[in-house]
Every structure is written in structure tokens, then in C-alpha cells.
């Protein structure tokens, strides 16, 4: 498992890196990889999302091949793009989504934040609102895209969309939950330290692959 910190990187550039890594994983020539990064301000909308949920187009918009509706990415938000071979981990997308939720809940618990899943809604929540968004794309059982955890994010751009298609959805950040300064480098380190071991526990590698399909 490779864990790569890309720092602050343009969305399109990060997407190209994901595509290359996914092709290598599918071909068997590359390792599973977790990309950790931040984006300049951008709205992304899933393949089945409604552009009517974007109320202000002053920020760039990208329609992408993931599940979910519209969300915001910007500085202070930890974005994780795992490129994972689900064909070797049971071909269970729903369990993979639960893995990401559980991982993020463990990470924020390190900062004494009690987070939870909301029935029927993908993501990580607190009593104050949505703390992390999750949207995954899968092709031939190799994953792209992933999660966006609000750490020190300016939450104002969320007021100009219906986050994940939900009008009036409250959004929060780790900094707001803690009530003080949170360092991005510490959050990245905790995600990176937990990711591989927890994935292997949650979705162990298997010797054989199921039919990937297309």
C-alpha cells in the first residue's frame, strides 16, 4: 500500500493521477494507493447529481464519475482518494463505504469528537452537522474518489449548494467540533497510520479475484 501526500493540488491534475493509478492496479502493475491532498475551491457533482443543487456558480464545477450529488472541496479540507482493488477484497462496495465511514469516525475520535453514521445517508456526522462527505467511483472493481473531511475548512461555500442534494443540510468541521486549532498534518498522519491496517481488517485481501466485469 502506497500513501502519497500531494499537498494542495488542482482537481483535474489529481483526477489524472487517480486514473493512471487505477489503470495500473487493474493491470496488476501497480500497488493500491491512498492519495491525501487538498484542493483549491471547486464544486464536484456525481454522475447522477442535480446541477440545480448548485446555487452559486462563482466557483468552478466538475461533474465526475462517482456516486452522490454535489459537494465542495477547498483548502483546509482533507481529501482522500483511495485506489483500491475490490476484486481482491470481496467485491462489496457497500462494505467499502462502511469502511471509510468507520475509519473517519475512528480518526476524529482521536480528537475527542463523537461522530456517527446517519441511517440512509452516506457520510460521517456529528450532532452539529455533516463532518465528512463520501463519494466513490468504481470501474472493473478498482475504486476512485473517496472522502472529504472538513478539518479547518471555510464552510461558507457549503451555504451556496445543497450538500449531497439535501437542502438546508448543516455542515461542520473538526476545528468547529474541537473548539480550537486543529493541525492538518496531524489529521493526515492519523488517517495514514490507520488506513492500511484497518482496511486489511475490514476487507482482507484474498488470493483469487472475482470476475471484474466492465
UniProtKB/Swiss-Prot annotation:
Matching SUPFAM superfamilies: Class II aaRS and biotin synthetases
GO BP: protein modification process
Name of the featured protein: Octanoyltransferase
Localization (cell): Cytoplasm
Keywords from the named record: Acyltransferase, Cytoplasm, Transferase
Site residues (Lowers pKa of active site Cys), renumbered to this chain: 130
GO CC annotations, alphabetized: cytoplasm
The species this protein was found in: Geotalea uraniireducens (strain Rf4) (Geobacter uraniireducens)
PROSITE patterns noted in UniProt: BPL_LPL_CATALYTIC (PS51733), LIPB (PS01313)
Major place of residence: cytoplasm
Functional pathway: Protein modification; protein lipoylation via endogenous pathway; protein N(6)-(lipoyl)lysine from octanoyl-[acyl-carrier-protein]: step 1/2
Leader sequence segment: none
Superkingdom assignment: Bacteria
InterPro entries: aa-tRNA-synth_II/BPL/LPL, BPL_LPL_catalytic, Octanoyltransferase, Octanoyltransferase_CS
PANTHER family: LIPOYLTRANSFERASE 2, MITOCHONDRIAL-RELATED (PTHR10993:SF7), OCTANOYLTRANSFERASE (PTHR10993)
Note: In the reaction, the free carboxyl group of octanoic acid is attached via an amide linkage to the epsilon-amino group of a specific lysine residue of lipoyl domains of lipoate-dependent enzymes.
Record bears the keyword Cytoplasm: yes
Binding site for substrate: 66-73, 133-135, 146-148
EC numbers, comma separated: 2.3.1.181
Gene of this entry: lipB
A GO MF label: lipoyl(octanoyl) transferase activity
Domain BPL/LPL catalytic, first and last residues per copy: 28-203
Pfam families: LplA-B_cat (PF21948)
Active site: 164 (acyl-thioester intermediate)
Reactions performed catalytically: octanoyl-[ACP] + L-lysyl-[protein] = N(6)-octanoyl-L-lysyl-[protein] + holo-[ACP] + H(+)
Family: Belongs to the LipB family.
Role, per record: Catalyzes the transfer of endogenously produced octanoic acid from octanoyl-acyl-carrier-protein onto the lipoyl domains of lipoate-dependent enzymes. Lipoyl-ACP can also act as a substrate although octanoyl-ACP is likely to be the physiological substrate.
Amino acid at each position: 500500500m502506497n500513501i502519497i501526500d500531494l499537498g494542495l493540488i488542482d482537481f483535474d491534475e489529481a483526477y489524472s493521477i487517480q486514473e493512471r493509478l487505477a489503470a495500473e492496479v487493474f493491470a496488476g502493475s501497480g500497488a493500491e494507493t491512498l492519495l491525501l491532498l487538498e484542493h483549491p475551491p471547486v464544486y464536484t457533482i456525481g454522475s447522477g447529481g442535480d446541477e440545480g443543487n448548485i446555487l452559486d456558480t462563482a466557483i468552478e464545477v466538475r461533474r465526475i464519475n462517482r456516486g452522490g450529488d454535489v459537494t465542495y472541496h477547498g483548502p483546509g479540507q482533507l481529501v482522500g482518494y483511495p485506489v483500491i482493488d475490490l476484486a481482491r477484497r470481496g467485491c462489496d462496495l457497500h462494505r467499502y463505504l462502511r469502511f471509510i465511514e468507520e475509519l473517519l469516525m475512528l480518526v476524529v475520535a482521536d480528537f475527542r469528537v463523537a461522530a456517527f453514521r446517519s441511517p440512509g445517508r452516506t457520510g460521517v456526522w456529528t450532532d452539529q452537522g455533516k463532518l465528512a462527505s463520501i463519494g466513490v467511483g468504481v470501474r472493473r472493481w478498482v475504486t476512485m474518489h473517496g472522502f472529504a473531511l472538513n478539518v479547518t475548512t471555510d464552510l461558507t461555500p457549503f451555504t451556496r449548494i445543497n450538500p449531497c442534494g439535501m437542502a438546508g443540510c448543516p455542515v461542520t468541521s473538526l476545528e468547529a467540533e474541537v473548539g480550537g486549532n486543529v493541525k492538518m498534518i496531524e489529521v493526515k498522519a492519523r488517517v495514514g497510520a490507520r488506513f492500511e491496517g484497518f482496511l486489511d481488517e475490514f476487507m482482507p485481501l484474498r488470493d483469487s479475484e472475482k470476475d471484474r466485469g466492465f
